[in-house]
Swiss-Prot record:
BP terms from Gene Ontology: division septum assembly
Family stated for the protein in its record: Belongs to the TRAFAC class TrmE-Era-EngA-EngB-Septin-like GTPase superfamily. EngB GTPase family.
Provenance organism: Rhizobium johnstonii (strain DSM 114642 / LMG 32736 / 3841) (Rhizobium leguminosarum bv. viciae)
Coiled coil stretches, renumbered: none
Residue ranges constituting the EngB-type G domain according to the UniProt record: 29-213
Name of protein: Probable GTP-binding protein EngB
Keyword hit for Flavoprotein: no
Cited PROSITE patterns: G_ENGB
Length: 217
């Protein structure tokens, strides 16, 4: 099977680097997708569930634990010459954690915003929204930035196992309506549960299509 036809989630993923500042970014090459969201929205848990590896992305009960851009790629590529992974998933620092020192928050914020504005290989940002709380002001601020920077993004609801199943369709419709007029928003809203596995295949397929890969498995 040609390298470009390898299923995206059919083999292990690895962590390749943490990026505390833009100087540490890997060279631009394969297309990237990034995961953004409020602190404790479940980014690390969702990444682990997507790739089927519980310990890949570190999870913590401490909000604001992720302080760098963390890069994950499919394993089995040397990274040299043309032997590059087909894509990278970037776990971005959580936003909206009020108890973090202001200097630290400002540093995280600048790193994330500079990355969003300047990364040519960034294909889409998946903005994670806790299904129990919906879109908050901090989320709206990030969506405003993405619209201004013309960076494509898609809303992904997390922790749907924490709300009544009957309420999920209504929440999907309400969320879609809230972002309907936003210029950079991808119109489809996804719902997921890392705990139950709900919606993971749909998200895997969405990522594969975004980076130009026909199959995710």
């Amino acid at each position: 099977m040609p390298e470009t036809e390898k299923p995206l989630f059919g083999h292990p993923w690895i962590f390749i680097r943490g990026v505390p500042s833009l100087n540490f970014l890997p060279p631009e090459g394969p297309l990237e997708v990034a995961f953004a969201g409020r602190s404790n929205v479940g980014k690390s848990s969702l990444i682990n569930a997507l790739v089927g590896q519980k310990g890949l992305a570190r999870t913590s009960n401490t909000p604001g634990r992720t302080q760098e851009l963390n890069y994950f790629v499919p394993d089995g590529y040397s990274g040299e010459g043309g032997d590059l992974p087909p894509t990278a998933i970037v776990d971005m620092p959580g936003y909206g954690y009020a108890q973090a020192p202001k200097e630290q928050v400002d540093k995280w914020t600048k790193l994330v915003f500079d990355y969003l504005r300047g990364r040519a290989t960034l294909k889409r940002v998946y903005v994670l929204i806790d299904s129990r709380h919906g879109i908050k002001k901090n989320d709206d601020d990030v969506l405003d930035l993405l619209d201004k920077a013309a960076v494509s993004y898609q809303i992904v609801l997390t922790k749907t196992d924490k709300i009544k199943a009957a309420g999920v369709p209504k929440l999907l419709a309400e969320t879609a309506e809230k972002i309907r007029k936003r210029p950079a928003a991808y119109p489809g809203v996804l719902s997921t549960s890392s705990e139950k596995g709900d919606g993971l295949d749909e998200l895997r397929q969405a990522i594969a299509e975004t980076v130009g890969i026909a199959r995710w498995k």
